[in-house]
Amino acid sequence: MTQIKVPTALIASVHGEGQHLFEPMAARCTCTTIISSSSTF
């Protein structure tokens, strides 16, 4: 699984004003994780 390291400050700003920009990225990450987990079984 690929780990993405993001600065805490960036996370904080994203969680605030830019959350609407980050949500699609988070959803994409979640989907990728689910697909990776599913292919493991």
Swiss-Prot record:
It is found in: Secreted, Cell wall. Maturation of thiazole and oxazole containing antibiotics involves the enzymatic condensation of a Cys, Ser or Thr with the alpha-carbonyl of the preceding amino acid to form a thioether or ether bond, then dehydration to form a double bond with the alpha-amino nitrogen. Thiazoline or oxazoline ring are dehydrogenated to form thiazole or oxazole rings. 2 forms exist: plantazolicin A and plantazolicin B. The structural difference between them is a dimethylation at Arg-28 in plantazolicin A. There is a cross-link at residues 30-31 (Thiazole-4-carboxylic acid (Thr-Cys)). There is a cross-link at residues 32-33 (5-methyloxazole-4-carboxylic acid (Thr-Thr)). Keywords: Antibiotic, Antimicrobial, Bacteriocin, Cell wall, Methylation, Secreted, Thioether bond. One of its GO terms (biological process) is defense response to Gram-positive bacterium. There is a cross-link at residues 39-40 (5-methyloxazoline-4-carboxylic acid (Ser-Thr)). There is a cross-link at residues 35-36 (Oxazole-4-carboxylic acid (Ile-Ser)). This is Plantazolicin.
